[in-house]
Amino acid sequence: MNKKELKDRLIKEKVSRALYSLDGGLPNEKLCLDHENGCWVVYYSERGIKTGMVSFPTEDEACEYIYDQINAIVIGKVK
């Protein structure tokens, strides 16, 4: 899946935008997706610091990973 498909899927599933940013940057307390130096990265941003950064060679892999991470958070909150 690409970034647009991911965004559409999260909107369709009514996932709160408070959980994530698909535009990178350093928003506070969000999972983030970004494209840096030719690779895709997923990280958690808190207080201007990127933590738990994971790099992927493809957009598809990064989008699947962040979707799974967001889904785990949502399911965890429901339980």
Please report, for each region that a protein language model flagged, where it lies by residue.
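Structured catalytic/translocation cores of nucleotide/phosphate-coupled proteins
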Residues: 1-5, 27, 33, 41, ...
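Negatively charged, low-complexity tracts enriched in Asp/Glu with abundant Ser/Thr
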Residues: 1-25
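Intrinsically disordered, low-complexity segments enriched in small/polar residues
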Residues: 18, 41-42, 63-65
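Intrinsically disordered, low-complexity charged/polar segments
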Residues: 20, 72-79
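A short, polar/proline- and glycine-enriched secondary-structure boundary/capping micro-motif
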Residues: 52-56
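A short, charged, amphipathic alpha-helix used as a generic interaction element across diverse proteins
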Residues: 57-73
